[in-house]
Amino acid sequence: MNTTINYYNLNAKNFIESTQNADMHMAQEKFLQLLPGSASILDFGCGSGRDTKYFLEKGYQVVATDGSAELCRLAGSFTGIEVKEMLFQELNEIGVYDGIWACSSILHLPKQELLPVIQKMCIALKDNSVIYTSFKYSNFEGERNGRYFTDFMEDTFREFIKVIEEEWITSDVRPGKGEEKWLNLILRKIQK
């Protein structure tokens, strides 16, 4: 994970330029439709702050985190809120959020670290709340372009976790990246 964080610290401005204006409206709205009107959202690995800003402008309460100090600084400036620097593994809240938005973020965890983090995410959710997450659409796991990636396809993710609420595949919305595919998922925490 340190290699990935170093990548984002060194390339934060270029990353923001390539992602801040990406049109995530369809995924954002699918996610928001599942939340109460005054929902509290954790933007877990907020990157540029694009989605945090969108949710704030829609009137939601948002807590934003990222593992990269430089992305936290720049996203905080963009969104107007403090972005907490933390690793995914450091999430330690209980029943706080109505939704967790982990857009193209937890895919940077090795598969063996991913399930414990998803379990922590579920603990941080209120009952019957949802997680949105997305992964590059393939079966690759390892370092690519200076960052670690765990990719999934529908069948491999279903084998990995059994609580999928909804899934869909989209093309990359960044300019020049339309040939790249993404697996989008909504997971629901069920009341026990």
Question: Which residues fall in each region the model found?
Answer:
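Class I (Rossmann-like) S-adenosyl-L-methionine-dependent methyltransferase catalytic domain
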Residues: 1-95, 112-116, 120, 130-192
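Conserved acidic residues
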Residues: 98
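A conserved beta-strand element that flanks and buttresses the S-adenosyl-L-methionine
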Residues: 101-102
